[in-house]
Amino acid sequence: MFRAQQNAFDDAVAKATDENLTSENWEYILDVCDKVGAEESGAKDAVAALIKRLAHRNANVQLYTLELANALAQNCGPKIHRELASRSFTDALLRLAGDRNTHQQVKSKILERMEDWTEMFASNPDFGIMEQAFMKLRTQNPNLQPPSKPGKREITDLDRQKEEEELQMALALSIREKSGSAPQPQVESSSSVSAPENQAQAAPAGPVPSGTSAATVSRVRALYDFQPSEPGELQFRKGDVIAVLESVYKDWWKGSLRGQTGIFPLNYVEKLPDPTVEELQREAQMEAEVFGQIKNVEKLLTLLSTRSSELNVQENEEITNLYNSTLSIRPKLVELIGKYSQKKDEFTQLNEKFIKARRDYESLLEASMAQPPQQQFGRPGQPQYGYPGSGAPAGYPRGPAQQHDPQRYFSPRPPDNQPNASYYPPATQSPGPGHTSPPGPYQQQPQQPAPDSYQPVHHRPESTYDQPQELGTSVYDSPVERLQYPPGPSGGQPHYQPPPQQTPQPDFSASSPNLVNQSQSPYPATPVTQPPPPTQQPPPVPGTASGSAPYPSASPSAANYQAYRPPQGGIPNHNPAAFYQ
């Protein structure tokens, strides 16, 4: 007979606060805001529709209604402010907050929104009803109001030392608990230590006291919603479990939640004890039950998909039993999804930290191993060919022979008291009939350098071979000690000096002696008018003679080794030792 008048905003408000929404739909919310501004009585009708939605028993509908009211207060001006600060709307808020069946998160959201509206309406004294309602709600429910954030004070050295001591005590306690079941003498000590811990776990959890070390706490649960006001703070809602990482400030810890890392105040969270053995067994049993129902869920899905549409599900006993058995795992499945989703975020974040730490370590390692280049003075040495020796002395080349640098071969400086005479006859003279040119590494210099270009060497050059061979016994001096012939007779016979030993070519090796260039004779031709030079030639370099060499290379200890014998005619008889002087 008497029917309430239909409100034009009921459908729009119900659409924006639907219980099936997963989050606030701002498209629907803005549609309501536009409609309120377009109609004369839009503010009054919209608030009336909001009061109806606050009476809904679904917590999501109540939360969406509070968000819609806050959006109207921010976008629709003084008209909606007056309706929100009315007695009817504030009484609806107080009634919902005082209901014991109302969700705790809804109560906290009511207190938060009333505080925001009180600050928003503070400039107009006509809207004082909202401030009165807020003070009344805070007095009646002191546990709803979140505490004020503590100041960010730096951690002192004493706090760091205390944290380290607590960490060492926790490690010692865990080691003692693990070894409690082994020797009998340790049973009393372990039981006496674990008794206070069991009492602490049985006690109700509360806010983390100031001064508690993060080294002994692995996770905390949020008691209130926290909105960051500065960069680097972690946002969370009531009931979220935060993994503790480290202490940053005096009453601020650093933690991770859903892949995000930041700091949070200690008075907004409560300490969660580590799970006991019974809790771990209970979780494992719950997971086993969920995974045990996988086959039943697949079987139920197969039966429902293969049956015809005319099948009466209520009359099919098998489908009914499968549905009832699998329906019980739904809450457990949702809980496991949330648990492993958080673990996935934690492992992902741990992997990112490990990658960053590995890159930092590698960069520091490369920087420590890098050495600054040493400045080189003078001409750098060339690499040595042939067999490696103990080190080449000054004057010996350490690389392949350069054609443009004939002075790199070792030659001693001639004495200053000798006459300025050429060691080699002119190249225009033809060789004598008794002169032979031994093959091997002896090559003629392209141009005889001036005496001033010689560098004096006052030590015996070392061989570049592993096993150098001497060609003279103890009776004779070594040919490399003195490289000049003794003064000749008065007849003016030219005297010859053995050419300096040259470094083998780059492709020379001990296993391939035939590769030595044998195309050029190191001794120039002698004058025709002069008597023939000595037929005995200096011995070749050890290791360079091949099978075709006229003089075999042998060590002094070999059986076929023969000492030097002077010729018996045509040439004055000189002592071999004096011959090499």
From Swiss-Prot:
A Pfam family reported for this protein in Swiss-Prot or TrEMBL:
SH3_1
Under the heading Gene3D superfamilies, the entry gives: 1.20.5.1940, 1.25.40.90, SH3 Domains (2.30.30.40)
Membrane topology category: Peripheral membrane protein
The VHS domain covers 16-145
State the compartments where it is located.
Endosome membrane
Name the keywords, alphabetized: Endosome, Membrane, Protein transport, SH3 domain, Transport
> In Gene Ontology terms, what is a biological process of this protein?
protein transport to vacuole involved in ubiquitin-dependent protein catabolic process via the multivesicular body sorting pathway
Polar residues biased stretches? 464-476, 508-521
Q: What are the residue boundaries of the UIM domain, all occurrences included? A: 162-181
Q: Where is the SH3 domain?
A: 215-274
Q: Where is the composition biased (Pro residues)?
A: 529-542
- Primary location: membrane
The record's listing under PANTHER family reads: JAK PATHWAY SIGNAL TRANSDUCTION ADAPTOR MOLECULE
Function noted in UniProt? Component of the ESCRT-0 complex which is the sorting receptor for ubiquitinated cargo proteins at the multivesicular body (MVB).
Question: What family does the entry list?
Answer: Belongs to the STAM family.
Q: What is this protein called?
A: Class E vacuolar protein-sorting machinery protein hse1
Query: What organism does the UniProt record list as the source?
Result: Emericella nidulans (strain FGSC A4 / ATCC 38163 / CBS 112.46 / NRRL 194 / M139) (Aspergillus nidulans)
Gene name, per UniProt, is hse1
